[in-house]
């Protein structure tokens, strides 16, 4: 998609719909389980919110004044991944939307003995307490890449 598509509130719905229409049938079959989500960057989240604000319904007015608990497209929640500050200095896509089952994304923290782990312990006599600091390694992975539907800004 072009950069203008990701900032135009009217185009956001088309992007979400394209992701759904072009998704693997196994993704679509899991909608009833309630674990699907659109993982989006903040610019897409904001543009979709502006799209909803532009609708003339009473609910749109109430949500624009009272705030929204969360956004969803056809019952599938949009999750703002809030990666803008981290992606700015990388070669990765700055704006994207990912449709998948939440259970398809794995986050792990290595708490076992590993060269990257560090644990420091000390006693603070002023507060009369033991303190500790630990450093762990974290990683994430996708279980099944065929269970992803992905759009990004070029």
Predicted regions and their residues:
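Sequence/fold signature of self-assembling virion shell proteins
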Residues: 1-21, 46-154
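Extended amphipathic alpha-helical segments with heptad-repeat/coiled-coil character used for oligomerization
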Residues: 1, 25-41
């Amino acid at each position: 998609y072009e950069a203008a598509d990701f900032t135009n509130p009217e185009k956001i719905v088309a992007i979400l719909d394209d992701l759904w229409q072009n998704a693997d049938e196994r993704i679509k079959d899991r909608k009833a389980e309630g674990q699907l989500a659109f993982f989006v960057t903040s610019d897409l989240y904001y543009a979709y919110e502006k799209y909803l604000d532009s609708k003339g319904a009473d609910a749109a007015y109430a949500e624009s004044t009272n705030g929204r608990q969360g956004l969803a497209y056809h019952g599938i929640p949009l999750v703002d991944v809030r990666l803008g500050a981290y992606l700015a200095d990388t070669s990765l896509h700055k704006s994207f939307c990912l449709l998948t089952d939440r259970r398809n994304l794995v986050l792990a923290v290595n708490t076992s003995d590993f060269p990257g782990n560090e644990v420091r312990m000390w006693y603070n006599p002023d507060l009369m307490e033991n303190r500790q600091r630990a450093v762990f390694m974290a990683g994430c992975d996708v279980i099944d890449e065929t269970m992803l539907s992905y759009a990004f800004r070029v």
